[in-house]
Amino acid sequence: MSGGYDLNLFISPPDCNFLCSVCHGVLKRPVRLPCSHIFCKKCILRWLARQKTCPCCRKEVRHRKMVHVNKLQKIIGRLEVKCRNAEAGCQVTCPLAHRKGHQDSCPFELMVCPNEGCMLRVPRGALDEHRQNCQHGAYHRCSLGCGATLGPVERANHNCYRELREAWCQRQQRSRTLVLCLLQHMRKMHRTTGLIRRQLADFLEEDDPLLVGAPQEEAEATPEGSIGVEVWEPQGQATL
């Protein structure tokens, strides 16, 4: 892996004096050897782990003799660079020294979804939308205030007003059905009551002559002068 910065990162081609002779990238954390040659710190340490000589002049090198070139690092830090998410669509350019600060807020920077169990990496600008629809997201109450507890899938299809209207329509339909059932029952009772009343009227019409003629027959069967009362006498009592 290269220890320096990629040349394609820079808006303008960097000066050749800013290049590392080991990785051929722009110097990153430059250090100078006693022989005055400058390299990326990471590159020269890797080199010296294999051999103890300068990559350019082959002179022997000791670690304690390396010096950080802070002035050169500041000059390189002022070079204009592209965002590392330029291919993803970010058009921002900034000094190399400010690149890290931009990455921390770049909307194109890939972020890991914070929901437990989700391994997707999405751009920072789309993270909020992803969290709302993530299948691993937590359940939340409806933000519109209906009180429903919804998961990510339910939230995507949830519509308080539509569901309330559907519930109201269902209730109205049940009410209409109940009223129709009651009306049918009342009509049936009305028909039954009418039938009973007609049968009772017919019965009264048939029995009316009998009820009227009964007193006349009793009067004809009773002799004149008799009160029609039988006198009871105790048995065995002598007649005086």
UniProtKB/Swiss-Prot annotation:
What GO MF annotations does this protein's record show? ubiquitin-protein transferase activity; zinc ion binding
List residue spans of TRAF-type Zn fingers.
Answer: 101-156
List the RING-type ZnF regions, as residue ranges: 20-58
Q: State the InterPro entries in the record.
A: Ubox_domain, Znf_RING, Znf_RING/FYVE/PHD, Znf_RING_CS, Znf_SIAH, Znf_TRAF
- Record-linked PROSITE patterns: ZF_RING_1, ZF_RING_2, ZF_SIAH, ZF_TRAF
The UniProt keywords, alphabetically, are: Metal-binding, Zinc, Zinc-finger
Q: Which GO terms describe its biological process?
A: protein ubiquitination
Keyword Disulfide bond assigned:
no
Has keyword Zinc-finger? yes
Protein name, entry field: RING finger protein 151
Q: Which organism is it from?
A: Bos taurus (Bovine)
